[in-house]
Amino acid sequence: DIGLTFERFDESEALKEDIEQRKLKAHLNQDNRDNPLNPREGYVLIAQFDSYGGPLGGNRTYIKYNLDLRNYYTLLDLLTFAVRINAGLISGWSSDYDQYESILFEKFYLGGSNTLRAVKPLRLLTNGNDQIDNDGNGLIDADDENESNDIPSGDIAMLLTNWEIRFPMPWRLGGVIFADGGNISNDFRSLNTNELVWNYGFALTLNLPVGPIRIDYAQDSKDASINQIQLGFLYAF
């Protein structure tokens, strides 16, 4: 999948310039699963390269890479073991681009029913805990680190892994035991296994002709008070 995209966005009152974004993309999606709705064998490889600005023009110039590998194995004829590893990196990002991020969401975010399930959607980092000068006054102060400031905050490097054991139950029901690990950072080299945020939990699925719907319960591996119940359509990956 190769394409060229031009986007223009209406500015908010807070922004003084129009937002114009031009992108050249090259995406590879190889899907060798035996069943896209309920896979038990096979793999998926997703590789994405998006180049913004540069010779194309626009407000911002940077490159975004994303690699996602998913594998599925049948165990004992009944169980399905599924694993995903997803890594992403943005090169050439400038702090000046952050003024558009609340509109475009081009950085990496984690949290929600398909990534870290013990975290609210997109809110592994928020403006209340990201140690970033969100108000642009040159200081990381109380206004930046107010815990009530629940606006999602992204970053330029991401590492995510998900592990699941899926099993059938009576009628159309199914169960999933899972563990999620991930983090986002301004430096990909800091995203080693010791720095990942881990959670674990279980899910109940209802298998429909259009695919499973699920209810997930997950809690943080270190602090059980950090937990979420999430709804999802299809499996997390």
Predicted features and spans:
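C-terminal beta-signal and adjacent terminal beta-strands/loops
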Residues: 179-192, 237
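Repeated loop/turn-to-beta-strand initiation elements of outer-membrane beta-barrel proteins
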Residues: 1-2, 34-38, 76-81, 171-175, ...
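Transmembrane beta-barrel wall of Gram-negative outer-membrane proteins
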Residues: 1-20, 24-26
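Flexible, glycine-rich linker and terminal segments associated
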Residues: 5, 119, 235-237
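Outer-membrane beta-barrel "beta-signal"
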Residues: 25-26, 202-212, 226-237
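C-terminal outer-membrane beta-barrel translocator/porin domains of Gram-negative envelope proteins
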Residues: 17, 21-167, 178, 185-186
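A short alpha/beta connector and helix-capping loop motif
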Residues: 190-204
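Transmembrane beta-strand segments that form the barrel wall of outer-membrane beta-barrel proteins
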Residues: 2-8, 43-55, 177-183, 212-221
